[in-house]
């Protein structure tokens, strides 16, 4: 049985194109595999703990800085529970709108919580990072209202898909498909662009 984790990064519900496209992809996958297990993670409804003093200090113990104590261990247990949910997925699906050239802050918060040594990555002083999540894949729907590939710099920059590509590579997920719906506000026929993205996702 395949487990799919759908991460909802837009707060706009049914008005969000990234949500709608990701939903269509998940529905198509369900139609192809009746045993597919889908876990929906709405980052705007989830109670994500602050990654502040204790969890940050606990993380540093893996790099030889400081020591665990009961307070740090409690904070780290909360981090581990959230991270294990992500690690349990065979296929990660994200619908990600572009916010100010980057990703929504709730998604960055989530990534900062789960990107932990010994769980998502290893680190060696001589060889750098090594991703620990193997034999998994990801499908990422990226949307924007203004920026598009090849656009003049006056229309923004992409720290959106580029960041996510780097992050997936860092944690070991190299089978990543990006489907873009960009831009949605400046084209003469935005519906045609949406339909192309939808066709690519439902045919996958």
UniProtKB/Swiss-Prot annotation:
EC numbers on record: 1.6.5.-, 1.7.1.17
Cofactor requirements of the protein: FMN
Cofactor: record remark: Binds 1 FMN per subunit.
Superkingdom, taxonomy of origin: Bacteria
SUPFAM superfamilies named in the record: Flavoproteins
Disulphide bridges, residue numbers: none
A Pfam family matched in the record: Flavodoxin_2
Alphabetic keyword roster: Flavoprotein, FMN, NAD, Oxidoreductase
A molecular-function term among this protein's GO annotations: oxidoreductase activity, acting on NAD(P)H as acceptor
Top enzyme class: oxidoreductase
Binding site for FMN: 10, 16-18
Catalyzed reactions: 2 a quinone + NADH + H(+) = 2 a 1,4-benzosemiquinone + NAD(+); N,N-dimethyl-1,4-phenylenediamine + anthranilate + 2 NAD(+) = 2-(4-dimethylaminophenyl)diazenylbenzoate + 2 NADH + 2 H(+)
UniProt similarity note: Belongs to the azoreductase type 1 family.
Subunit structure: Homodimer.
Known function: Quinone reductase that provides resistance to thiol-specific stress caused by electrophilic quinones.
Protein name, UniProt field: FMN-dependent NADH:quinone oxidoreductase
Record lineage: Bacteria, Pseudomonadati, Pseudomonadota, Alphaproteobacteria, Rhodobacterales
């Amino acid at each position: 049985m395949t487990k799919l984790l759908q991460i909802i990064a837009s707060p706009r519900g049914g008005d969000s194109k990234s949500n709608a496209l990701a939903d269509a992809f998940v529905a198509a996958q369900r139609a192809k595999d009746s045993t597919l297990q889908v876990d929906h993670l709405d980052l705007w409804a989830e109670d994500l703990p602050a990654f502040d003093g204790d969890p940050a200090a606990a993380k540093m113990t893996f790099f030889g800085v400081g020591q665990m104590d009961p307070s740090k261990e409690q904070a780290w247990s909360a981090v581990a529970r959230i991270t294990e949910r992500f690690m349990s997925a065979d296929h990660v699906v994200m619908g990600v709108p572009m916010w100010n050239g980057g990703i929504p802050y709730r998604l960055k918060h989530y990534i900062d919580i789960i990107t932990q040594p010994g769980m998502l990555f290893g680190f060696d002083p001589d060889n750098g990072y090594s991703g620990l999540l193997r034999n998994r894949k990801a499908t990422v729907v990226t949307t924007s209202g203004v920026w598009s590939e090849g656009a003049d710099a006056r229309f923004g920059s992409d720290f959106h898909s580029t960041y996510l590509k780097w992050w997936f590579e860092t944690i070991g997920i190299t089978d990543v498909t990006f489907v873009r719906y960009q831009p949605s506000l400046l084209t003469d026929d935005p519906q045609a662009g949406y339909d192309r993205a939808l066709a690519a996702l439902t045919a996958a």
